[in-house]
Curated annotation (Swiss-Prot):
This is Molybdopterin synthase catalytic subunit. It comes from Coccidioides immitis (strain RS) (Valley fever fungus). Signal peptide: none annotated. Its main location: cytoplasm. Pathway: Cofactor biosynthesis; molybdopterin biosynthesis. Catalytic subunit of the molybdopterin synthase complex, a complex that catalyzes the conversion of precursor Z into molybdopterin. Acts by mediating the incorporation of 2 sulfur atoms from thiocarboxylated MOCS2A into precursor Z to generate a dithiolene group. The keyword Cytoplasm applies. Residues 183-196 have a biased composition (Basic and acidic residues).
Length: 196
């Protein structure tokens, strides 16, 4: 009578030590701050996208969108404020799945260019810790006329908050570092009221 082979996995080799050697597995590149900034520049649309762990540079983002055809340049800077729902904020900490976030940001920018006839769009977002008073997002819009620039700037911001794969942890004064509340950027409306 024949027997079927065992489906059990083979035994592991005996270890000569009670401690297994530590294996270092590096983080994926999108979680490694040394691989940043990560940028996209789409020409001829004049679209500049950046994810960075460094302070934002508003003049750089305006420079990428300026055009002789533009009669209006609008810059929005989203800044870490010192309180949230009456709790004192120590800092915000942002994380992202960068490969997808870059794709989503470029899609938002392309949609805005097509819809509003823009001359250029820059979107930059900070990752990592962002202290009170520092910018976490910069949006620069260049358009032939101010109405299109203002409308596009607000739409781009709201689409970023609604769609981009970036999450934030609000850390409050008096809490241990690394603690806090994780939130999606879309958890508040344009006036700061909670939507959840």
């Amino acid at each position: 009578m024949s027997t079927l082979p065992s489906t059990d996995p083979p035994p592991l080799p005996a270890s000569t030590s009670s401690q297994q050697p530590a294996v270092h597995i590096p983080p994926p590149s999108y979680l490694d701050p040394t691989t940043y900034p990560q940028t996209l520049y789409l020409d001829p649309e004049r679209i500049f996208i950046e994810l960075t762990y460094h302070p934002l540079s508003p003049s750089t983002y305006l420079a990428h969108t300026r055009s002789p055809a533009a009669g209006a340049n609008v810059l929005f800077l989203g800044t870490t404020r010192d309180t949230f729902e009456d709790k004192p904020v120590a800092r915000l900490a942002y994380t992202s799945y960068a490969p997808l976030a870059l794709r989503t940001l470029s899609s938002i920018a392309r949609d805005a260019v097509a819809k509003h006839g823009l001359c250029g769009v820059s979107i930059a977002h900070r990752l990592g810790d962002v202290a009170v008073g520092e910018e976490s997002i910069a949006i620069a819009i260049s358009a032939p006329h101010r109405g299109a620039a203002w409308r596009a700037g607000e739409e781009v911001l709201e689409e970023c908050k609604r769609r981009v794969e970036i999450w934030k942890r609000e850390e409050f004064v008096g809490e241990p570092p690394g603690q806090g509340e994780w939130r999606a950027n879309r958890d508040t409306d344009p006036e700061g009221k909670s939507t959840s």
